[in-house]
Amino acid sequence: MHLNSFCLKKVLWVGLSLLVGGISINTHAVTLNFSASLVQGTCSLSLDKSVLSLGDVQQANLRSETLLNLQPVTLTVDNCNGAASASLQPVVIALGPGKSQNGKWLFRSSDSDVGGAGVMLVQSASQPSYASTEVKSGDYFPLAAVGQTPVNKQLQFFAGVSCGGVTDCATVKPGQLTANVNFIFAYR
């Protein structure tokens, strides 16, 4: 009897396999696509004012190697997140149109109609003078060491009107002076 039950089980399994194998089932396939972006860490940048008015400057007061109507502006770097690359340094880069006059970079937009003058920007916690090192387009300000994520930080700047040296100051004409500087978070 034991042999018969073994044979009966085998026959049932073979029959069931043939039955299931012989049935045609319509199948439908769907595809699941994946995507992801790998990004470096970043920070939020904000200025304490969006427009920095340098007021009216008397043409007669705009002399060689002077910096007039200085005004402070603060750049805040915060909400930093994500991991920094082990070989790169987080920085803020200053970019803007202008030109070098008497060895000093003066920011100035192409729509300015004033002659010979521009805006000198200095990164300093205290009021600078014309002799201070100015910010040039492309200068960068480190926020942390290489491979480190920055912590909240404030960078103090001062901006003032200048005409550079004797030659450029001789070409000063009255008009509207506009300048812009973009501060960009980057890894270097």
Segments from the language model and where they lie:
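Mature extracellular/passenger domains of Gram-negative fimbrial/pilin and adhesin proteins
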Residues: H2-C7, G22, N26-R188
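Bacterial N-terminal signal peptides
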Residues: W13-G22
